[in-house]
Amino acid sequence: MVLDAVGNPQTVLLLGGTSEIGLAICERYLHNSAARIVLACLPDDPRREDAAAAMKQAGARSVELIDFDALDTDSHPKMIEAAFSGGDVDVAIVAFGLLGDAEELWQNQRKAVQIAEINYTAAVSVGVLLAEKMRAQGFGQIIAMSSAAGERVRRANFVYGSTKAGLDGFYLGLSEALREYGVRVLVIRPGQVRTRMSAHLKEAPLTVDKEYVANLAVTASAKGKELVWAPAAFRYVMMVLRHIPRSIFRKLPI
């Protein structure tokens, strides 16, 4: 990667430019060194200017806003070109997505398709484009925000969980495909994180703050890791849940 003298990235791209977790990761990188931050978000997102201001206040060398509509996959090549037009991108964070109402999603075809297109199809679209660019660079780090919900899909939120299962599988495979080209991929599987998106939910065990996820993302990337859980204990929880028979699993209060 194009790093400074002590190994910090010079350019960070955030796909989902107003994502609280994504911005926390950017800010964590800025704690180490000033960097160019590129925020890709909806042109009418009311939080985009505040996000840019927060990055400047956190110490960004410069902040660029580019338009990104996850649903408009035909526009993604042009968006990625714009993101790389100012030079190589060292770190790209894929942190956009919807949660939705779990019970409504499986009973509403339009909303089910929408969340699948945003959480999975769009994530694949930008992943392929990022891989192409970083492969040409010969370096780069992709950080993909997955979810513990995708590791074993539960009845409680199976539409959302299934989209994250797809994203998770794609980026783990992309990690293998890019290994020989000097490009790294980190998949993060958080449980519940305290953000706007989860504010209406009852807090679950092992819930963490976005700053915890951000610190994990930066430190795990620096160590060359490919898959981490947030918190780490979720790895062992999911290890057990993955092997519980369906007849028993469906009776668990999760």
From Swiss-Prot:
Identification of the protein by name: Decaprenylphosphoryl-2-keto-beta-D-erythro-pentose reductase
EC number: 1.1.1.333
Coiled coil listed as a keyword: no
Gene3D superfamilies membership: NAD(P)-binding Rossmann-like Domain (3.40.50.720)
Key words of the record: Cell wall biogenesis/degradation, NAD, Oxidoreductase, Periplasm
Top enzyme category: oxidoreductase
Residues reported in the UniProt entry to bind NAD(+): 67, 164
Biological function: Component of the DprE1-DprE2 complex that catalyzes the 2-step epimerization of decaprenyl-phospho-ribose (DPR) to decaprenyl-phospho-arabinose (DPA), a key precursor that serves as the arabinose donor required for the synthesis of cell-wall arabinans. DprE1 catalyzes the first step of epimerization, namely FAD-dependent oxidation of the C2' hydroxyl of DPR to yield the keto intermediate decaprenyl-phospho-2'-keto-D-arabinose (DPX).
GO biological process, one term: arabinan biosynthetic process
Superkingdom in the source lineage: Bacteria
Known catalytic reactions: trans,octa-cis-decaprenylphospho-beta-D-arabinofuranose + NAD(+) = trans,octa-cis-decaprenylphospho-beta-D-erythro-pentofuranosid-2-ulose + NADH + H(+)
A GO MF term: oxidoreductase activity
Extra remark: Was identified as a high-confidence drug target.
Places the protein is found: Periplasm
Subunit note: Interacts with DprE1 to form an epimerase complex.
Gene Ontology CC annotations of this record: periplasmic space; plasma membrane
Disruption phenotype: Traditional knockout mutant with dprE2 disruption could not be achieved, suggesting this gene is essential. Conditional knock-down mutant of dprE2 show that down-regulation of DprE2 results in growth arrest in vitro. Cells lacking this gene display impaired growth.
Stored InterPro entries: NAD(P)-bd_dom_sf, Sc_DH/Rdtase_CS, SDR_fam
Endpoints of the signal sequence: none
Similarity remark: Belongs to the short-chain dehydrogenases/reductases (SDR) family.
Pathway this chain belongs to: Cell wall biogenesis; cell wall polysaccharide biosynthesis
Active site: 160 (proton acceptor)
